[in-house]
């Protein structure tokens, strides 16, 4: 190459060098993606056991896993339409596992998800110099919030107020919520409940589609608009 009256020899990358450089760039990109995924999981999945709750680890014993799969596959619509899930059933039916599968799948797609429980949230709120409003705002900032084991938290006036505040804040922002609980649908709809519990459960049922995970549900499911949306997704 002639430059300013002088001849310069410019080396050209051979095909193997180009390929090696491309492979190195791809390797660095994969490593960066894995680093970001690890960071999202470290923040969003506080309990390490949640990390292993993935669709590929499902044993196929409960067909309700299909609902979780369809929810992930149609996440864009679920988020836009503010469709949440209320995964119900006795201990050991897989409802928390299903929620974890959804969380991990969306995290791997680059979405920000928080999976936690109200016991942990309330402990953070009562810690030294905790800013309750900031904690709630942080939970609202996630595109998807998953609350595991609703009903195990303490029932003090303060606790119930904060539980409602978290749920209502997401309701006002029209952001989806997934809840797992051992409570039955009849329990959550009971008129014998105190006002604090009634307004919490009423808000959840307004936001989430009830899905019974304990085998065949002998209770009559309500034909709500959101339930129909999820059923349509499953049946194609």
Question: What label would you give each PLM region?
Answer:
Residues 111-112, 141-144, 173-179:
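Loop/turn-to-beta-strand initiation segments
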Residues 1-62, 221-236:
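A short, basic N-terminal segment
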Residues 65-69, 103-142, 154-161:
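Short glycine-rich substrate-engagement loop in P-loop NTPases that contacts/grips substrate
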Residues 85, 114, 146, 178, ...:
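Hydrophobic/aromatic beta-strand patches that form the interior of the parallel beta-sheet core
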Residues 79-99:
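Walker A/P-loop nucleotide-binding motif
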Residues 44-45, 51, 57-85:
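Pre-Walker A (pre-P-loop) alpha-helix and adjacent loop at the N terminus of AAA/AAA+ ATPase modules
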Residues 149-150:
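Walker B catalytic acidic pair
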